[in-house]
């Protein structure tokens, strides 16, 4: 009985693992970007910068990307990889100067 259960569990895990694709360059929270630096919105320097450019963020713990540029999924594999801070960000209200709602990613 135990051996049948072990075989069933092993087969089930194998099917689940095969059916769940994982793409390293997938960005589910926004646009994939490379930022020169990242900081939380409540960091004094970041907060001052956001105030100067008129960006209001309600979540003070939100990760903010500074001086960001888009990364294309095609470009990641062909040499334009991000050597600074690769992140997925919800929005970039001031072009690439500030990106809001960022999540770190591995590329």
UniProtKB/Swiss-Prot annotation:
Only weekly expressed in hyphae cultured in liquid medium. HgfI has been widely tested in the development of antibacterial materials and as a biological drug carrier. Keywords: Cell wall, Disulfide bond, Secreted, Signal. Its main location: secreted. GO terms for molecular function: structural constituent of cell wall. Disulfide bonds join 27-88, 34-82, 35-68, 89-102. Aerial growth, conidiation, and dispersal of filamentous fungi in the environment rely upon a capability of their secreting small amphipathic proteins called hydrophobins (HPBs) with low sequence identity. Class I can self-assemble into an outermost layer of rodlet bundles on aerial cell surfaces, conferring cellular hydrophobicity that supports fungal growth, development and dispersal; whereas Class II form highly ordered films at water-air interfaces through intermolecular interactions but contribute nothing to the rodlet structure. Self-assembles to form functional amyloid fibrils called rodlets with a length range 100-150 nm. Self-assembly into fibrillar rodlets occurs spontaneously at hydrophobic:hydrophilic interfaces and the rodlets further associate laterally to form amphipathic monolayers. Belongs to the fungal hydrophobin family. This is Class I hydrophobin hgfI.
